[in-house]
């Protein structure tokens, strides 16, 4: 199954099973779950880009970008970073309803 670029995904499972980093558009709840579960998959959230969903389509917003840490990092540092990423999505979810998560492996790009 390929990632549908014209769809907003509501499940973090889809992100991990399809390799959604950088391209998958996620609902706020799914993006929060991705951030919270990323460490379990050996990933660190390096960037989140938020926007507004127009069915279909993603309007990226320059006022909704969060930059995390770049790998390589250890697991503890990644977990702290990923929790901060989840908090960012929570704080932006009233104004923005779709998010793109960039999450490389903690060992490096």
Curated annotation (Swiss-Prot):
UniProt record, GO biological process: bacteriocin immunity
Pfam family for this entry, one: ImmE5
Quaternary structure and partners: Specifically interacts with cognate toxin CdiA, which inhibits the toxin.
Function: Immunity protein component of a toxin-immunity protein module, which functions as a cellular contact-dependent growth inhibition (CDI) system. CDI modules allow bacteria to communicate with and inhibit the growth of closely related neighboring bacteria in a contact-dependent fashion. Neutralizes the toxic activity of cognate toxin CdiA (C-terminal 282 residue CT fragment) upon expression in E.coli. Does not inhibit toxic activity of CdiA from other strains of B.pseudomallei.
Protein name as it appears in the record: Immunity protein CdiI
Gene that this sequence comes from: cdiI
């Amino acid at each position: 199954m390929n990632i549908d670029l014209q769809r907003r995904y509501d499940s973090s499972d889809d992100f991990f099973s399809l390799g959604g980093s950088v391209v998958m558009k996620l609902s706020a709840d799914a993006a929060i779950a991705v951030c919270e579960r990323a460490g379990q998959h050996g990933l660190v959230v390096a960037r989140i880009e938020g926007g507004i969903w127009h069915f279909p389509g993603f309007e990226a917003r320059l006022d909704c970008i969060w930059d995390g840490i770049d790998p390589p990092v250890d697991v503890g540092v990644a977990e702290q970073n990923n929790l901060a990423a989840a908090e960012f999505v929570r704080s932006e979810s009233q104004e923005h309803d779709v998010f793109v998560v960039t999450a490389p492996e903690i060992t490096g790009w």
